[in-house]
């Protein structure tokens, strides 16, 4: 049953009986103190939340989405694995293992170097398990679960319940599956799993040495398993030089190392809001991002997280998208990967020569061969690097990398066309769609990068250069308006290139970098049916790259549009649309991450995190000792927090609350907080449940406003308040440390 409701001036759909009592679906708008529970979806999502925020996909035959596959990519520093269960995988005897790759074999960008356990090498991925002396196989799968680790849960079979936990080794060339066998009977069972060490493949690696890919089972010596007890063993796929000793498989040690990374994601840059969907998807997105370093000949570098494009970096994915976020996560490993990437670029420009030459846009494969050029890469690098260095507030690294910023600016100046915008052969789509001789993305990113680079230059005592950057940015802003500003398909917005007569998704970028003259109609265009694709019946949601009937969805444009909406002060619109997008991307077809289809690219997941940091909270470094906040607290929220954020070399807690409430969101009356309903306590504190059903607060479904309109912003360090200011939602708060 689906009811049409009117919510904040927008039509939304409410679907009854959306999930069972164990979970709350992410499509629920978890709202406190009378805010309606609504949903856009006409079908149940594939994934739902458990009470601790873990994602769960129950295999109960009720999945109505057209694409039944479950797949995603994860990796450690020296191994990458794709966890994949095809749509027709209903036979319990067919237990597919992960697809595994190792960077050491990646000679060329087109070299897939794909090892597929269970295909050609082994008939199944099922270890030889003996129960009471007889062969044992697991029963049908009952659920998938993701809490940082991916688990496959099985129904009991002959008194044994199996669970498989799949994850990569953080440090070793090893992909692991840890099997847990539990005795569900009231009597003892004898369990035995013979150990296995089998060579699957011998091949030359990038170092021209002979390497072995091995299938290993740690095994279980015959033992008696008492009722309720369990035993574990590991299945591993490993790669090693033939001359080296076999890798030591220590499942407990490997699991702890991986759990430590998951713990970092849970405790750093911690989002606390009344919305369980945002809290939990943000948490799991951080796990995916923290796993984005991989080994190359230059050392660890930040990569795209993809099965197809692993072992390399790109000016758009890793500089433009990822760099601004990395300092906030407080991960030394991630910073190391970003630093190594920029040092490769520094070395390249030193060797490549004159400032009128294009900068290499990507370095691909284990040996980091230079590939792309002419995509506006200089603007992408300028934007990402300047944001990264200013947020780090590290004088030494900023001085080291400043020449790369100058080199990018010099090239951009040399490539101004007669209209004063930047000429570029193509953009990040690399010719998939027309871009003319000059495109909006390149000039908009250059404008945004110049502004931040000028701030950075002043911190380094390079005031004359900083002044030049500011002047360049001012001139470029005027040229963007004159050259790209246009009426397109009825909207006063931007054309993407000179001959362009169709709306393009990248019209969000001027809004992202602070160009506001065409803000209102640009947002209208972005979320019109010409660009915004929303199909409740299939949970399909994305922004089209171009307003045609052809399939041109590009998920990164979706999150840039959402960032633009928040930055433009359209908080309710942005919040509504981001919930819809997350339901589709993280709880629907692509769950549990927002990675792009086919390539499993990490970029949308990173951009989602930036929608929160830059959009919802409006974090923007101003200098090495100051930053500004523009908190866009939704009208229906009493509070929001972003805790343990690493910013300007300090670990801070950012807390925003409605004036007249405490930091937990309780309304204050006569000096003391009024208690919330228990369901709302759960929604705020454990992040796994939404607030109470709307009928408890009246049947008219109106959004109540129980708090004052002013907000209180507090900045804390180690529990000590550094700053406290009040103002209106959307006000700019400058914080000096």
Q: Model-found features: residue ranges?
A:
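Hydrophobic alpha-helical scaffolding
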Residues: 224-226, 247-251, 268-275, 311, ...
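Structural helix-adjacent loops and short alpha-helical linkers that scaffold large soluble proteins
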Residues: 272-279, 325-342, 389-406, 454-474, ...
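N-terminal secretory signal peptides that target proteins for export/translocation
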Residues: 1-21
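Non-catalytic carbohydrate-binding regions of carbohydrate-active enzymes
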Residues: 464-493, 521-650
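Aromatic-rich carbohydrate-recognition surfaces in CAZymes
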Residues: 183, 223-225, 231, 310-419, ...
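Extended glycan-interaction surfaces of carbohydrate-active proteins
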Residues: 272-313, 337-373, 402, 408-438, ...
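Bacterial N-terminal signal peptides
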Residues: 26-36
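Terminal accessory carbohydrate-recognition/targeting modules of carbohydrate-active enzymes
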Residues: 20, 38-280, 328-332, 570-574, ...
